[in-house]
Amino acid sequence: MSASLSRDSSSAPSLPNRRPSIVSSSSRPRQIIETARVGSLGTLDEAGNPFVSLVTVAALEPTRLILLLSGLAQHTKNLDRAPNCSLLLVEPGGEQGNPLAGARLTISGSAKRLARDGDEIARACFLAAHRSAAAYAEFEDFSFFQLDVDQIHLVAGFGRIETISASQLTSSND
């Protein structure tokens, strides 16, 4: 005897055509950007191959992030050659339990090295978030980089996915 798995569509609840925007219903992308202190930076190596490394990060604004990078690091050499990059940030605490159930976002943008004589605001922002970095921020081979956000791909949990532009992020009123 075989069981029938057909459903009566007349008894199924009706669903709205479109889920409300994650951005308009919460300030989650900005919260993640403002509270994340560590991220995975994706760059392209000399051969054009993807290269991912762990970096520390601080938000100057939701669309301008600051990184402190060593000139000895491969990701720094990659950014100097090709500034387009991505940065994965995970909502603090989201790495516990099932990390795929937590919120995270991938930032796409461009990173530029800041001049040492004009990086005071970036320096203050970064060192406020990473006090221990003061021990090496003055080393000659370290420089601050500003990552300018072009767009964000937000995964706010299972099935809650949205790609937003930098202008949408800054115009959100939540």
Q: Across the structure, where does each feature detected by a protein language model lie?
A:
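C-terminal edge-of-domain segments
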Residues: S2-S24, A129-D174
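An N-terminal domain-cap segment
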Residues: A3-R7, A12-D80, L88
